[in-house]
């Protein structure tokens, strides 16, 4: 995969070259370039912004630097690419979007700054994404989050490809609880089922606890997926168990 980032602050992306993404670059699974589009400015002061027509607060990014930076990307890497604009008005980024984008050969991230963009810049863009209903100083942090989420899904990037397939949200559910040694610590024990070596029971426990965690923490996710009969049965068990716990807690508080 080729990833290009257009940013006024290229040094912000250096930490991405560490750890997992750094290994992806070393293994030649990823080419990662950051372009400072200030270098495409047309005036001696290297301005890339200007006041908006019609008045208003703040400054807008001018079209020329970003259009010409994209020209440079297209010259170096001809061919189709997804061009992503980080914008609060974009669609919400999620795991499904990360999975889809990880299938692409070339991604370009445009990171804005200041009050906003000249509207003509949007003609360069294939996708607009937001991390949530809040505004950040620039597009760099959202781009880094997206890049990390996407690159870890590339085959061969994680030490164990199964890790990506058991992540939270991969099957629409939150991930089940996990434990390592020691089997008991400060009175907290690892569930016996995880220690008995029965893989069928372990798989059932994990599915049930994944459903439980989703039901308790993100019940909205259960409305967006279709559960098979086994999962539906496990979810009914979870709801019964949690209702019993809640009733017992109420009685305890009343006594």
UniProtKB/Swiss-Prot annotation:
User: Looking at the record's lineage, which domain of life comes first?
Assistant: Bacteria
Query: Which BP terms does GO give this entry?
Result: tRNA N1-guanine methylation
Q: Which GO terms describe its molecular function?
A: tRNA (guanine(37)-N1)-methyltransferase activity
Q: Name one Pfam family in it.
A: tRNA_m1G_MT
**Which top-level enzyme class is recorded in the Swiss-Prot or TrEMBL entry?**
transferase
Enzyme Commission no: 2.1.1.228
User: One GO CC annotation, please?
Assistant: cytosol
Q: What UniProt keywords are attached to this protein's entry?
A: Cytoplasm, Methyltransferase, S-adenosyl-L-methionine, Transferase, tRNA processing
| Subcellular location, record wording | Cytoplasm
Predominant location? cytoplasm
Quaternary arrangement and interactors, per the entry? Answer: Homodimer.
| Protein name, UniProt field | tRNA (guanine-N(1)-)-methyltransferase
Q: Lineage of this protein's species?
A: Bacteria, Bacillati, Bacillota, Bacilli, Lactobacillales
Task: Provide the gene name from the record.
Answer: trmD
């Amino acid at each position: 995969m080729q990833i290009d980032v257009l940013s006024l602050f290229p040094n912000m992306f250096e930490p991405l070259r560490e750890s997992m993404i750094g290994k992806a670059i070393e293994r030649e699974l990823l080419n990662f370039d950051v372009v400072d589009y200030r270098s495409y400015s047309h005036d001696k002061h290297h301005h890339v912004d200007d006041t908006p027509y019609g008045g208003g607060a703040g400054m807008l990014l001018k079209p020329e630097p970003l259009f010409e930076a994209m020209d440079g990307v297209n010259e170096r890497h001809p061919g189709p690419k997804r061009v992503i604009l980080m914008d609060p008005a974009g669609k919400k980024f999620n795991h499904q979007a990360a999975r889809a984008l990880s299938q692409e050969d070339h991604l370009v991230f445009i990171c804005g700054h200041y009050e906003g963009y000249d509207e003509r810049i949007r003609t360069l863009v294939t996708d607009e994404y937001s991390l949530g209903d809040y505004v950040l100083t620039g597009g760099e942090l959202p781009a880094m989050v997206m890049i990390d989420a996407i690159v870890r899904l590339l085959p061969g990037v994680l030490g164990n490809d199964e890790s990506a397939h058991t992540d939270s949200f991969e099957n629409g559910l939150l991930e089940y609880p996990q434990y390592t040694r020691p089997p008991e610590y400060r009175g907290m024990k690892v569930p016996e089922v995880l220690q008995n070596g029965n893989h069928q029971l372990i798989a059932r426990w994990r599915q049930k606890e994944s459903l439980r965690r989703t039901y308790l923490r993100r019940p909205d996710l259960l409305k967006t997926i279709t559960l098979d009969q086994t999962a539906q049965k496990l979810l009914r068990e979870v709801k019964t168990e949690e209702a019993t716990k809640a009733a017992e807690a109420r009685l305890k508080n009343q006594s």
